[in-house]
């Protein structure tokens, strides 16, 4: 079982867990969720469950050690005649060591599973001559299967340790509660990357399954299944064909593959997040959203505030801010202000933290040259965008261009989409050199001839497939537009989200927004839409004869 939309998950694990959860006493419901989580993990990764357990026990022990140091520091500071500065420095040093030890253990396991082979490939040309001269043998390490979700739960583990160190949360003395936070079965494969303060208490609370949560959660799961099975899995064969032999195609086909891969990745990943959030809703747990209409973005920075949101905020809070506030970068910022001024200086200095974020982001996804290029690509786009913004603003003001006008906003959307498609092409390529080769053909040999001669219909998708995907994308656009307008309504956006992440209709200011939200949230309409989704999945889903099941794409990261 490697898919959330498999019969094993939808027909056995999820309903079985829900029934067992509801019938036993509230105080023991956490045990049902934890058992389901470990059974799911075992079904996918078998004995590698031991590494998840090791990670959990490590942060539990380190958290308790940090908690002890925090309490002892408080007692030492309250002691008569205490040298407060010396006490703070002493305990801060010890607490940093404890936090670092826990982080190193967890990141070390991640490195061992994901990056040893890549590191060997990079270092071998440099180290091999020296080792040969010294008579030391160095065998190439073999690639090994990693525990499912290790990239996700490792970041959760590190965030817990840092938050305890910062005293944002109190160390949990209950190992089982911490284990459930680390392993909750809907999010174990693909996230979202949660903070302890967001979900731990809700998972432990054992809220009963209500009819409203069951219906809204199930409909969210259906919506995710439709995105994955109707769109993502349908375009998979064309994407695989073109990326595997890009030398055989002109720039037009490569552009088509890049666009379809971006759509595939979004529908697969956001569809999986719909399952995860919907399942959490059934059990009364509000998991953080990972997507917020990313293709409505007008800049590259905005795109990454809407795409894989929990990963972006993790790197912001645990990499960007610490690096930016470090003493060397502060000194660099001061020097940059003197050289470049108060506007450009901080932008230039922020490049250090931004580079750390984007190299980390790229390598978090995988060990390969394409992931390094992916990170460098987005670093360059966003960093240079920071330099260009004040210059562009000055030019537009002199030319009298209204940046809030529809034509300019449309230009921004189109420009951002082109950047996104290029970035995802790099991301999907089979290696760094392949990414560069595809970009070279995309821009150097662009042609629409393959669309006219029928080549595009011989790559795994026929006319009916393209029509099906086109209609599905149109539906996604309309739903996204509805959500976008709802979230930009000042009154509606100020209220808690209702069904499917939308605010209550009664809070909207405009008549159009009120009508759209009321229609969306009408009970009968939701049931009709739910039945329509089931019918659409049955009729148009890419499964059965002629289709190869596609594992969740982000599960491999």
Regions found by a protein language model. Give the residues of each.
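Membrane-embedded transmembrane alpha-helical bundles that form the catalytic cores
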Residues: 1-556
